[in-house]
Every structure is written in structure tokens, then in C-alpha cells.
């Protein structure tokens, strides 16, 4: 059995487990659904933070933008959004199955496209910053977005907005959104897996390793940074649309733009598993989500202490993440050939040259 066959077998096993999970664990459907969203968070943050070395603290902006874009489209197709939100939930729009599904599909498309466009626009503003200045700049943009939406009366301001109600059985609704969460995470993984097999990965890794050298070799760094952020925003917008519909209500600061929770979680999960890899963010998201759910259930009141200790252990003892630590400790298990420094430097230069061709 060759490596490719084993890899396909692993993918099939994991996908099968994901499909069977809501039937094997019916009492934990929502928790497992959120796990897929967490995996998507970690994967998309790693596009910029791990592969390119630009640590964004504002990716939650695209999650919230997708959520609101989807809500506006889904409601606006059949009702005036301003009248709907000004009624403070007193007005309920009755949807047929056809109307509801049409709204979901168009809402997903709008969420993805608008979030990607926002990444392009804000990229022009913040990509002149580097290092901690970029991180702080993106954090400021995300916080400002949440505050602006909180003051926007047309979409409910701080009172939020209710999503359209599913016109069917609650159990069916749970399964629909579970599989939408699963599909979004799988689509993100598959697309990034393909993207990282192209010259695009060589280019963004070259930017991470030495941006000045990459520019000197002919790599259009602004273009690659913009595309990378737009790709991450595209999938984050989709996840925002799905999550908003799944919980049924959007509140700007705690649900759509939760900078101090989901916004930080996506960074921590990628670092925990090992940034700059495809499997590290998945491992980190899974471990983090399990620990979070266990502490929220059995250590209520101490859950933030437990998560804080997890972050401290990660930073002190596993600076390369769990996957990076395992690769350093047992490189032969991962097919890694240990090279001396001169050969490694030569390989880096060759990678930059290939990316610029």
C-alpha cells in the first residue's frame, strides 16, 4: 500500500466519521457542528498567520460580515429589512421551503463574495504594516466593525437581528446545519490542500521567510497577500452565514464580531496544533474545542483559567505547536530528512526562485 492510498484511506475514514457523528452522538450535534466551524477558523487563520507570517487578529471581521450579509439577503428577498429589525422581533416572516432554501443559497453566496471583497479593500489599507503593527491594525479594524454595526439601526443596531425561521422539524434543522458546517470545513480543507500544492504556497512561504528577498526575486508580495486574505475571508464569510442561521439570532459584539472569544480562539487553535501546516490547525482546533467544552461543562467558573493555562503551556513548552514538536522529536515518522544549515539555506533560495518564475 503506497502513501497515496493510505492518505486517501485516512481522508475517507475521517469523512465517514464526520458523516456518522450526528447519528452516533445525537445529544452532541451542535457541539460537533461548532467543532467544524472551529477547524475552518484555524485553517483560514493559518493561511496568513502560518503560511505567510502575517499574524492577523482581525479575521473575525469576515465571519461577522458574512453573517450580516446573509441575513440581509435572506430577509431582504421577501421583506423590508429596516421594518423587520425595527419591529424588535414582533414581526415574523413565514417562509416556504423553497423561499427558505433560496435565501440560504443566495445568502451563502453573498456572504462569501462580500467577505472576500472586504479583504481586498482592507488589505490595501493594512498591508503596508508589518509585524505587531499589522496585528494591531487588523484588530482595530475588527473592533471598529463591531462598533459600527452596533450603531447601524437598519440592521438592528445593538439589539441584533433574528434570522429567518426554518419551516420544518427542529431535528431536521439541526442535521441540515450540521452537514453545512461539515461541508464548509471539508471544502476549506480540500481547497487549501490544492492551493498549497501550487506555486502559490512557495510564494507566500517566501514572503514569510524573507519578504524583501521575495520582492527582489520578482514576487508581487501585495498581490499574494491580498489573494491569501481574500481566500481566508471567502470561507470565513461562508462560516458566518451558516453559524448565524444555525443559532437563529445575530448580535453584533457577542455573536457576529466576538473579537475576544472566537477572534482569539482561531489564533490559539492554529498555534496549538502547529501553524504553517495543513494538519496542525485541525489538530489544534479539535483539542482546543474538546478542552473548551469539557471545562465549560465541568469547571464552570474556572473555564477561562483552564484555557489560559493551556495557552501558557503551549507557549512555553510547544512553541512550534504539537505537530511541530512531534516532527522535531520524531522527524523520520513524518518523512523529514534532516539537512545541515547550508543546504537548508540553499533550498530556501531555490524555493523563492521557483515561486518568482
PLM feature spans:
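Transmembrane alpha-helices and adjacent helix-loop boundaries
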Residues: 1-357
Amino acid at each position: 500500500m503506497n502513501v497515496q492510498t493510505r492518505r486517501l484511506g485516512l481522508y475517507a475514514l475521517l469523512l465517514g466519521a464526520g458523516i456518522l457523528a450526528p447519528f452516533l452522538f445525537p445529544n452532541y450535534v451542535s457541539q460537533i457542528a461548532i467543532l467544524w466551524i472551529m477547524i475552518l477558523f484555524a485553517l483560514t487563520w493559518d493561511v496568513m498567520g502560518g503560511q505567510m507570517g502575517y499574524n492577523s487578529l482581525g479575521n473575525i471581521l469576515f465571519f461577522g460580515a458574512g453573517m450580516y450579509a446573509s441575513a440581509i439577503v435572506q430577509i431582504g428577498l421577501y421583506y423590508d429589512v429596516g421594518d423587520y429589525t425595527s419591529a424588535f422581533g414582533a414581526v415574523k416572516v413565514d417562509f416556504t421551503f423553497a423561499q427558505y432554501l433560496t435565501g440560504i443559497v443566495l445568502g451563502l453566496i453573498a456572504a462569501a463574495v462580500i467577505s472576500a471583497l472586504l479583504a481586498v479593500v482592507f488589505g490595501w489599507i493594512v498591508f503596508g504594516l508589518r509585524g505587531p503593527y499589522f496585528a494591531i491594525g487588523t484588530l482595530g479594524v475588527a473592533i471598529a466593525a463591531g462598533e459600527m454595526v452596533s450603531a447601524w439601526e437598519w440592521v438592528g443596531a445593538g439589539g441584533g437581528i433574528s434570522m429567518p425561521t426554518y419551516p420544518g422539524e427542529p431535528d431536521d434543522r439541526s442535521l441540515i446545519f450540521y452537514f453545512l458546517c461539515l461541508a464548509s470545513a471539508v471544502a476549506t480543507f480540500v481547497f487549501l490542500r490544492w492551493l498549497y500544492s501550487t506555486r502559490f504556497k512557495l510564494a507566500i512561504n517566501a514572503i514569510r521567510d524573507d519578504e524583501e528577498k521575495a520582492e527582489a526575486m520578482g514576487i508581487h508580495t501585495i498581490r499574494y497577500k491580498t489573494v491569501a486574505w481574500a481566500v481566508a475571508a471567502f470561507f470565513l464569510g461562508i462560516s458566518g452565514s451558516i453559524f448565524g442561521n444555525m443559532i437563529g439570532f445575530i448580535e453584533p459584539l457577542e455573536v457576529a464580531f466576538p473579537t475576544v472569544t472566537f477572534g482569539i480562539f482561531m489564533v490559539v487553535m492554529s498555534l496549538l496544533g502547529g501553524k504553517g501546516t495543513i494538519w496542525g490547525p485541525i489538530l489544534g482546533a479539535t483539542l482546543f474545542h474538546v478542552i473548551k467544552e469539557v471545562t465549560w461543562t465541568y469547571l464552570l467558573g474556572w473555564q477561562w483559567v483552564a484555557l489560559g493555562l493551556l495557552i501558557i503551556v503551549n507557549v512555553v513548552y510547544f512553541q512550534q505547536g504539537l505537530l511541530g514538536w512531534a516532527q522535531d522529536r520524531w522527524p523520520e515518522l513524518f518523512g523529514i530528512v534532516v539537512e545541515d544549515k547550508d543546504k537548508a539555506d540553499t533550498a530556501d533560495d531555490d524555493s523563492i526562485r521557483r515561486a518568482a518564475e
